Amino acid sequence: MLTWAITRAGYDVPAFAKKFPKILEWLEGQKKPTVKQLEEFSKKVYLPFGYLFLPQPPQEKLPIPFFRTNGNQADKIGINVYDTILLLQRRQDWLKNYLKDNDFPPLPYVGKFHNRNNVKEIVADIRQTLQLPENWASHFKTWQEAQDHLVLHIEDKGIITIFNGIVENNTHRPIPVDECRGFVLVDEYAPFMFVNNSDFKSAQMFTIVHELAHIWTGHSAGFDFRRLQPANDPIEI
């Protein structure tokens, strides 16, 4: 279980032992950890403390499909991306329940093009819903100004947009751009978009537009967009 927890956090044992030397004594059976030491260990590897007492490692599945530019769906992602997705799913669940309990209607554009993949038609509907004229971005001097304007229109329609490059507010847990440029959690009441703000502004705009298309087609997903190309997958094309 200890080795699994270390690997899950993205370390190998020798590298982790440099940060946490006592782990070698535990793995070799020379000493047994105290409860306090196990609590410290669980924090180092970003693992719920109770997991350490399970008879075997739990089967953790990706919470959403995660597309790689090489055409494959990932079967594993880094722990920082994984934890960020779970964190935002919990926030989304709370907001969705709040909106439903207070009789807010579902958002009509979510999944509107679920069985259609006409890109021009989808883009036109997105622009119409967000009330953006053609070539709207050309009226702004910088990518930041254009992005601020776009996000204002997006959030006005009920889409939650989060920009972050770390897990919550933990600066020791960065989210690498080459692993995750963003992800979208589709829901008819509370769609969430996450954008890695460690990325270039132009790349962030690409991610935002791509995530909007996923909301309109009704598919949650994460992306790496290496070389700013979508994955070779029917959902992505």
Positions of predicted regions on the chain:
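Short juxta-domain linker segments that transition from a proline/glycine-rich
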Residues: 1-237
